[in-house]
Amino acid sequence: MNGTYNTCGSSDLTWPPAIKLGFYAYLGVLLVLGLLLNSLALWVFCCRMQQWTETRIYMTNLAVADLCLLCTLPFVLHSLRDTSDTPLCQLSQGIYLTNRYMSISLVTAIAVDRYVAVRHPLRARGLRSPRQAAAVCAVLWVLVIGSLVARWLLGIQEGGFCFRSTRHNFNSMAFPLLGFYLPLAVVVFCSLKVVTALAQRPPTDVGQAEATRKAARMVWANLLVFVVCFLPLHVGLTVRLAVGWNACALLETIRRALYITSKLSDANCCLDAICYYYMAKEFQEASALAVAPSAKAHKSQDSLCVTLA
C-alpha cells in the first residue's frame, strides 16, 4: 500500500455555480473577518498588554499561524477557477498546511498549560514560565515545518486546496492523521481533567464561583471549536484511507466531503480570535484562584481585567 498511488478521481473537482459562489462568499468573509480579528489580537498582545505570560505567548503564536493561513485564502479562491499544480500553488499549499497543523499543535500546548495551571497549581510555578512557553512554540514550529518540508522533499503530496487526488497514498495520509488524533486525545484529556478540577473546587464566595463557572464554560467552548473545526476533515481522511484506492465512485464523494470539511476547518482562524480575550482572562483568573486566598485572588482578577481592557 505504501508505494501505490490512487488511480481514481484524476480529474479536478467541479462544482455547480451556486455552490462555487457559496465558497467564494464563505472564504471571503473568513478572510476579511479573520484578518481584522487576528490583526487586532496581535496588536493587543504586542502593544497593549504589559507582561509576557505563558498564555500570551501561546496565543500570539496562534494568531501568527492563523494570519499566515488566512493569507493563503486568496489562492484557495483562485483554485476554484484554476487547479493547476504550479510552484506557487504548492508553496501556498505548504503554508496552508503548516499553519493548520501549527494551530492544532498550539491549541494542544494551551490545553496542557491550562491543565498544569489548574490541576497542579503548586508544581506549575516550576513547570510554567514565559521562557519555557517560547521554547515550546519554537520547537512546535520546527517540528511542523520540518515534517512538511521532509514530505515535500520525498515527493509525497497531499491534496490540500489544490485538490487533485491522483497521488494520494498511505504515506500522505499518515502525517495529517497523526498530527490530529494525538493532539485530539491530549486536548480531550486535559479539558476533562480541568473541568473536573473546577467542578470539585469548593467556592468560597460568589465571585470565585462565577469565575470558576466562566472558566469551565471556556474549556467546553475551546474543545467544541477544536472538534467541530478539525474532526470532520480528519474523519474524512480516515474513511478515505479505510475504503482503499480503487473504489472510484465512493472516492469521488469522499473528495467532495474532504474539500468541504477542509474549508470548515478554516473557520478556526476566526473562532480562535474570538476566544483570545476570554482565554487570557478566565484562565489566568482560575490559576490565581487555585493558589491564592480569596481576597488576594479578587485583587489579581481586578488587576488582570484592567490590563486586558
Swiss-Prot record:
Residues 46-56, 113-135, 196-218, 280-309 are cytoplasmic. InterPro entries: GPCR_Rhodpsn, GPCR_Rhodpsn_7TM, GPR35_7tmA. The keyword Transmembrane applies. It is a multi-pass membrane protein. Disulfide bonds join C89-C162. It is found in: Cell membrane. Changing S303A: Almost complete loss of ARRB2 recruitment. PROSITE patterns: G_PROTEIN_RECEP_F1_1, G_PROTEIN_RECEP_F1_2. Residues 1-24, 78-90, 157-174, 240-258 are extracellular. Keywords: Cell membrane, Disulfide bond, G-protein coupled receptor, Glycoprotein, Membrane, Phosphoprotein, Receptor, Transducer, Transmembrane, Transmembrane helix. Multiply phosphorylated in clusters of serines and threonines in the C-terminal tail. Phosphorylation of Ser-300 and Ser-303 is mediated by GRK5 and/or GRK6. The keyword Ribonucleoprotein does not apply. GO terms for molecular function: C-X-C chemokine receptor activity; G protein-coupled receptor activity. Predominantly expressed in immune and gastrointestinal tissues. The modification Phosphoserine is found at S287, S294, S300, S303. The modification Phosphothreonine is found at T307. Pfam families: 7tm_1. GO terms for biological process: chemokine-mediated signaling pathway; cytoskeleton organization; G protein-coupled receptor signaling pathway; negative regulation of voltage-gated calcium channel activity; positive regulation of cytosolic calcium ion concentration. GO terms for cellular component: plasma membrane. Belongs to the G-protein coupled receptor 1 family. G-protein coupled receptor that binds to several ligands including the tryptophan metabolite kynurenic acid (KYNA), lysophosphatidic acid (LPA) or 5-hydroxyindoleacetic acid (5-HIAA) with high affinity, leading to rapid and transient activation of numerous intracellular signaling pathways. Plays a role in neutrophil recruitment to sites of inflammation and bacterial clearance through the major serotonin metabolite 5-HIAA that acts as a physiological ligand. Stimulates lipid metabolism, thermogenic, and anti-inflammatory gene expression in adipose tissue once activated by kynurenic acid. Interacts with GNA13. Interacts with ARRB2. This is G-protein coupled receptor 35.
